[in-house]
Structures are given as C-alpha cells and as structure tokens.
Amino acid sequence: MSVDVKSAQSSKSDSLQAEPRPGERDKALNLVLGQIERNFGKGSIMRLGDASRMRVETFPTGALTLDLALGGGYPKGRVVEVYGPESSGKTTLTLHAIAEVQRRGGVAAFVDAEHALDPVYAASLGVDIENLLVSQPDTGEMALEIVDQLVRSAAVDIVVVDSVAALTPRSEIEGEMGDLAVGSQARLMSQAMRKITGNIGKSGCTVIFLNQLRLKIGVTYGNPETTTGGNALKFYASVRLDIRRIQTLKRGTEEYGIRAKVKVAKNKVAPPFRIAEFDILFGRGISTLGCLLDLAEETGVVIRKGAWYSYEGDNIGQGRDNTITWLEQNSEAQEQIEVLVRQKLTEGSEVTANSMRPLAAAARTAAKKPAVSLASEAA
C-alpha cells in the first residue's frame, strides 16, 4: 500500500511540474498573438478591453422616442433591417437617417432598387439631394455589388437599400414570365451578406435594408407574416425594426399624417423589444415636436389633464395639435422643456443627451422649409 501511495504522490508532482508557469503562459500567448498579427494583419485579433472600436457608436434616427428605444440611435458599422406594410413610413424613416448623417458631414448613398425615390420629398425632410449618391440598378447582383464597393471604400457613412423585395436576380430578369426561380433571391441575399458583413464592420458604414412583408401559406396558428429574401438578413442584421401605421391623423375630414409605431424586434447593441411611437406628417416627415411632447408628458415635465396640457401650472393648449402649435410659437419655452426632458431621461440611463441632436433646433429648421403637396405621403 505504501508503494501505491508513493507512486501516486510522484505522479501528482510530475503533473504539477509539467504545467507551464503563469509567466510562461503569458509569453506563449504573446508569441502566438504576434504570429497571428504577422500572418493576418494588425487588428486580426485583440483583447476586447483594449479595442476602442469595439464600443459601438450611434447616430440619431430623427425621432427622439426611437433613439431612446434603440439605446441612442442607429449603430455605426452594423446592418439594420426596417420592414413593415405599405405606406407605414419605411422610406421616410431612412431618409431622416440620411439627413442626420449628412448634417454631421457624412456621405450617404441610396440604392433605389424600386426606382421610386422622390427627390422633392427627400429634400423637404432635410436630405442634401445634390450630394446624395443615388443608384438605380438593373439587377439584384448589380445592386449588392454596388453596396459592397461603397462599403469597401470606407468613404461612405450610410447606405440605404430600397428594397430587398426589388432585388431581382439576373436569372429571373433574363428569363420569361412564369419561369420558376425558387429560392434564387434567398441565395443571392445569403451570398451577399456573407461577403459584405465583415467589410461593414471594418469601414464603420451603416447599411439599412428596407423590406416588405409577405404572408406564409397554410399558417393556421401564429403570425403568418414574413419578410422577403430568405432568412440570411434576419441573422446578419444587428437591429430589426418593425414599423406599422396605427392611426391616421385628421383635421376634420382632411388627412395630414399618420401615427407610426416601431417595435425593435431585434437589437444586438441594446435591450430589444422596446416600442416607440411618433407622428409622420405628409410632406414634412417625422414630427420632432410631437416626439418632444410625448416624452415631456411621459416624464412629467408637461402635465395632461383631460384634453388640456399644462406646463409649470399654466395651460398651454387644448388637444395635442394645439399644444404642438404653441411649442412652435414659443421657442424659449420649447428649449426649456427639452432641457428638462433630457435631464429626466439621462438620469440612470446609458443614453447621453449629447448623443442626440437638439429637437428645438431641428423643429425650427423644419418649420422654415416649405411643405410639399399632400401627394407625397409617407412612403
């Protein structure tokens, strides 16, 4: 028995001696890290705490309520998918994103696969159409190749693709009407996402795909809705936004806008499943003052009793529309309310007030622009 004990102790001591010391492990790790960087380039592997670029930056969406739902705005260097029914505000939402990027000196591109971009409406939302890069590709392969080259250049800050449903494969265009092309668009999107996703992260360019809804056949239970282009985009997208029209805004019998509701269906950079609501006015886009009033009421800066809104004990308007008009006419009070709202929102929140453009300045800028005709509805 004593022999067995001695042999066990000796084997244990041998195993302890065989283990590398902490200093040797660090030396070996640094050696292999250096070898990887020499083989694949600097930055191919890193410690997460040492990489400043791993902190995801954001830029505003144009609606403060949506900025808060997203944790600050759209993430830079990520893929975003915006989907919803027709005339729910998808294109309007992305045009506001383009305007925000251009306002900060960035370069924007719009891949108009649907061939339906309205330059007059885009200009009314604040888009600098003279410096906006626009492409109207003939095929889906051409559109995605253009996106890939723009992303690789690292000179473009945002690319919008309108829409995935309009990215028609070349084989389908060259074929005849009625020819079956099962899964061709899904294969195209899957290949494209594999190719461009890595370059998107390296360049810091945000790529926003607009998508349409379809109904799955034979679904009895559950939601029958699905998006076009297969499942690849769902996996590669860091943020997915489901936008819906929940109300039509009217003055008497005249329709002047819609109430939109956005659900963050997926978010890899902030908590998901948050909901934001805002008004989209025909010819003017997202109502920044409407967003401010909603958040002022939610935070208690503005009190609503019945139909009346009050600020600091004084009634400022009866009904939502009259209160927004009062805010437009009283810029000083508007700025005071905005400051108070931001103070309330940033208490214990990761979203900083500096990460969002002041709404008062945005509202004054929008008020100076002439509204286009009501024919330019929310896309």
Curated annotation (Swiss-Prot):
Keyword 4Fe-4S recorded: no
Predominant cellular place of this UniProt entry's protein: cytoplasm
Record's subcellular location: Cytoplasm
UniProt-annotated stretches for the region Disordered: 1-24
SUPFAM superfamilies: P-loop containing nucleoside triphosphate hydrolases (SSF52540), RecA protein, C-terminal domain (SSF54752)
CDD domains xrefs: RecA (cd00983)
GO cellular component labels: cytosol
GO molecular function: ATP binding; ATP hydrolysis activity; ATP-dependent DNA damage sensor activity; damaged DNA binding; single-stranded DNA binding
Lineage of source species: Bacteria, Bacillati, Cyanobacteriota, Cyanophyceae, Synechococcales
Biased composition (Polar residues): 7-16
Keywords, ordered alphabetically: ATP-binding, Cytoplasm, DNA damage, DNA recombination, DNA repair, DNA-binding, Nucleotide-binding, SOS response
Organism: Prochlorococcus marinus (strain MIT 9303)
Name the UniProt record assigns to this protein: Protein RecA
Claim: Nucleotide-binding is one of the keywords in the record: yes
Task of the protein: Can catalyze the hydrolysis of ATP in the presence of single-stranded DNA, the ATP-dependent uptake of single-stranded DNA by duplex DNA, and the ATP-dependent hybridization of homologous single-stranded DNAs. It interacts with LexA causing its activation and leading to its autocatalytic cleavage.
Superkingdom in the source lineage: Bacteria
Binding sites annotated in the UniProt record for ATP: 84-91
A Pfam family: RecA
Gene3D superfamilies cross-referenced by the UniProt entry: P-loop containing nucleotide triphosphate hydrolases (3.40.50.300)
GO biological process, any: DNA recombination
InterPro entries, A to Z: AAA+_ATPase, DNA_recomb/repair_RecA, DNA_recomb/repair_RecA_CS, P-loop_NTPase, RecA-like_C, RecA-like_N, RecA_ATP-bd, RecA_C_sf
Endpoints of the signal sequence: none
Family the entry assigns: Belongs to the RecA family.
